[in-house]
Amino acid sequence: MLVIHFKPYNNLKMSFTSTENKHLLGVYEKAINNKFAWKDKIAIAKQASFDFIELSIDESDARLQRLDWSDTEINQLHNELQAQTFCLNSMCLSAHRRFPLGSKNKTTVQQGLTIFEKACVLARKLGIRIIQLAAYDVYYEPHDTETERNFITNMRKVAELAQKYAVTIAFEVMDTPFAGTIVRCLNLIKRIGKANILLYPDIGNLSQFSTAVFDEIALGQDKIVGFHFKDTLPKQFKEVPFGTGTAQFEAALKAIHQYVPTVPILIEMWSKNDPAESTVQNVAQLKQAKQFYEQQWDLALKRVK
């Protein structure tokens, strides 16, 4: 029997007299060396002064297995979070690369829907607020009008499951043209016809498909529940060191400051998973990324003034 006494936000000191607009800052789980146990992952993120970790459920068998965690395993993670007064705020559900909702294979689609429902249950048990969805109709299969139509149809089922479990779902602005901009995601949401599908833009991805990042964020402001902060290059969407890419950080942060100043922001980066890496070294890497992030805010706000 699962017994939960977890307070997902007990690391946050809330003041109802404060009117300061300040967002929570999280870090992607994959930024932390995969060799570390959850106890160490939480400690690393906390020591680097982050507010939460975004849980990864990707297409690998190892991470898909998390959807079948026992109540004992879930309680163990709860206990670690409680002990360190930390939380998981969101889930990056990228498993639909492998099990796309737009597939022409009905078995694959059913697997994708099952994965999503299991993700909703896990999110409920872990106190996760947001499930970020990869807005691919297909990834490894050829895209055409049929895969797009299948995606629209099956996303209606996903939206209904999210309502059933009272979980917030949001499209990530993706690394493919299909959903590479906020405008395109809004168009998909309109076609799906479900108001509970929201947006979780990725600044790096958006920068490669739009020259109007500020305007895109302004347009999507009523739907936005969070942001991924990462650097990118044309045709390279992962593992671009901060400051070496072409992500339009200044425009994005100015828009966030003006239109959605309190939504959570997550620094997305990837550990090299060096077997010899220490917790101290991993903390230092996260702190370095956070410093770059803060510098970008300083630059953006200086020019606002």
From Swiss-Prot:
SUPFAM superfamilies (UniProt xref)? Xylose isomerase-like (SSF51658)
A GO biological process of this protein is: L-ascorbic acid catabolic process
Check the record and name the NCBIfam families matching this protein.
Answer: hxl6Piso_put, PRK13209.1, PRK13210.1
| Protein name listed in UniProt | Probable L-ribulose-5-phosphate 3-epimerase UlaE
Question: What is the E.C. number?
Answer: 5.1.3.22
Which spans of this chain does the record mark as coiled coil?
none
Question: So, what pathway does this thing act in?
Answer: Cofactor degradation; L-ascorbate degradation; D-xylulose 5-phosphate from L-ascorbate: step 3/4
Keywords, A to Z, come to: Isomerase
Enzyme type, top EC level: isomerase
| Native source organism of the sequence | Mycoplasma pneumoniae (strain ATCC 29342 / M129 / Subtype 1) (Mycoplasmoides pneumoniae)
Please name one Pfam family that this protein belongs to: AP_endonuc_2
Can you name one GO molecular function term for this protein? Answer: intramolecular oxidoreductase activity, interconverting aldoses and ketoses
Which reaction is this enzyme known to catalyze? L-ribulose 5-phosphate = L-xylulose 5-phosphate
What the record says about family reads: Belongs to the L-ribulose-5-phosphate 3-epimerase family.
Task performed by this protein: Catalyzes the isomerization of L-xylulose-5-phosphate to L-ribulose-5-phosphate. Is involved in the anaerobic L-ascorbate utilization.
